[in-house]
């Protein structure tokens, strides 16, 4: 008789793991949380959608204000306010625009919107004198029309010296255009040829592009670079100061999520390239909404401020019972001077310190009197 096996059949049983799966929190890959940008853009859309006061909309006779359309368009212009820790360009003045990458074209919707605007969206191309006959508007039309891009006029440096040499003629011609592209080999000579007025606006400041490959003019290189600027880049004018305005276009040009994409990408580039302190978003007629601040940069500024204050306190000395601020040179002079003569040597500093003290006391007494009168 066969013995029964005492071993139980090993059947695979799925036992629930006691260990809980760790929930991985998704962190924003950008410096500014996307939700914050979405909320800010939506709030600005709501704000600009509010109707204007009746006094602004209608005149005394009930007719529409002639400037209403312009005001309506202006109040929807979206912009970033970017504050840097120090000057963006230093002491030197730069005529060259900085190009920021964007996910959604800035120029394409601008051109579409210009169909019903006062000013048409037009593109000017400036080439070297030797290249002007190597390409025509028709050649560029064949290469660019599929992308909805049109170069309206092509000129060379010689034209600016002759045809548009007169101040009025030159300014009238340049002001027609919303985008000016120029061969990178001549862009540095254009401020003199175009005049300073052209560089007051971003839209009439020429953007340098490559037109040559292997030291030869190339239609392919030219058209590729035109497409790159038109479809994927946004020009900004870097200021000498610490505050940069980045114009993002009219709120009606793009969908809200497209503006959010562009804001994220632009902010990321600027934060990486500079010591950005803070970033805000607004329209021409709205309050400013905060998007970003860099605590490390703010801490650095605070540390510098504290250091300056400490240095100022260290420079204070007492002469004849008066607290006086002395420069490094005067402190050295004080060390070698006769102590009995310090009052006469630094009489000017002592008198200034006394005046400051008396004015501060007067201010305090006047404030206390004002408080007493308010209480009585």
UniProtKB/Swiss-Prot annotation:
<dbReference type="GO" id="GO:0030674">
    <property type="term" value="F:protein-macromolecule adaptor activity"/>
</dbReference>
<dbReference type="InterPro" id="IPR028364">
    <property type="entry name" value="Ribosomal_uL1/biogenesis"/>
</dbReference>
<protein>
    <recommendedName>
        <fullName>Proteasome-interacting protein CIC1</fullName>
    </recommendedName>
</protein>
<feature type="region of interest" description="Required for interaction with CDC4">
    <location>
        <begin position="310"/>
        <end position="376"/>
    </location>
</feature>
<comment type="function">
    <text>An adapter protein that specifically links the 26S proteasome to its substrate CDC4 which is one of the substrate recognition subunits of the SCF E3 ubiquitin ligase complex. Required for turnover of cell cycle regulatory proteins CDC4 and GRR1. Required for synthesis and nuclear export of 60S ribosomal subunits. Required for vegetative growth.</text>
</comment>
<dbReference type="GO" id="GO:0000463">
    <property type="term" value="P:maturation of LSU-rRNA from tricistronic rRNA transcript (SSU-rRNA, 5.8S rRNA, LSU-rRNA)"/>
</dbReference>
<dbReference type="InterPro" id="IPR023674">
    <property type="entry name" value="Ribosomal_uL1-like"/>
</dbReference>
<dbReference type="GO" id="GO:0043023">
    <property type="term" value="F:ribosomal large subunit binding"/>
</dbReference>
<dbReference type="GO" id="GO:0070628">
    <property type="term" value="F:proteasome binding"/>
</dbReference>
<dbReference type="GO" id="GO:0042273">
    <property type="term" value="P:ribosomal large subunit biogenesis"/>
</dbReference>
<dbReference type="GO" id="GO:0030687">
    <property type="term" value="C:preribosome, large subunit precursor"/>
</dbReference>
<dbReference type="GO" id="GO:0070180">
    <property type="term" value="F:large ribosomal subunit rRNA binding"/>
</dbReference>
<feature type="region of interest" description="Disordered">
    <location>
        <begin position="356"/>
        <end position="376"/>
    </location>
</feature>
<dbReference type="GO" id="GO:0000502">
    <property type="term" value="C:proteasome complex"/>
</dbReference>
<comment type="subunit">
    <text>Interacts with CDC4, PRE4, PRE6, RPT1 and SCL1 as part of the fully assembled 26S proteasome. Interacts with pre-ribosomal particles constituent NOP7.</text>
</comment>
<dbReference type="GO" id="GO:0006364">
    <property type="term" value="P:rRNA processing"/>
</dbReference>
<keyword id="KW-0539">Nucleus</keyword>
<dbReference type="GO" id="GO:0005730">
    <property type="term" value="C:nucleolus"/>
</dbReference>
<dbReference type="GO" id="GO:0003723">
    <property type="term" value="F:RNA binding"/>
</dbReference>
<keyword id="KW-0647">Proteasome</keyword>
<feature type="region of interest" description="Disordered">
    <location>
        <begin position="1"/>
        <end position="29"/>
    </location>
</feature>
<dbReference type="GO" id="GO:0030163">
    <property type="term" value="P:protein catabolic process"/>
</dbReference>
<dbReference type="GO" id="GO:0042802">
    <property type="term" value="F:identical protein binding"/>
</dbReference>
<keyword id="KW-0690">Ribosome biogenesis</keyword>
<dbReference type="GO" id="GO:0019843">
    <property type="term" value="F:rRNA binding"/>
</dbReference>
<dbReference type="GO" id="GO:0000466">
    <property type="term" value="P:maturation of 5.8S rRNA from tricistronic rRNA transcript (SSU-rRNA, 5.8S rRNA, LSU-rRNA)"/>
</dbReference>
<feature type="compositionally biased region" description="Basic and acidic residues">
    <location>
        <begin position="357"/>
        <end position="376"/>
    </location>
</feature>
<dbReference type="Pfam" id="PF00687">
    <property type="entry name" value="Ribosomal_L1"/>
</dbReference>
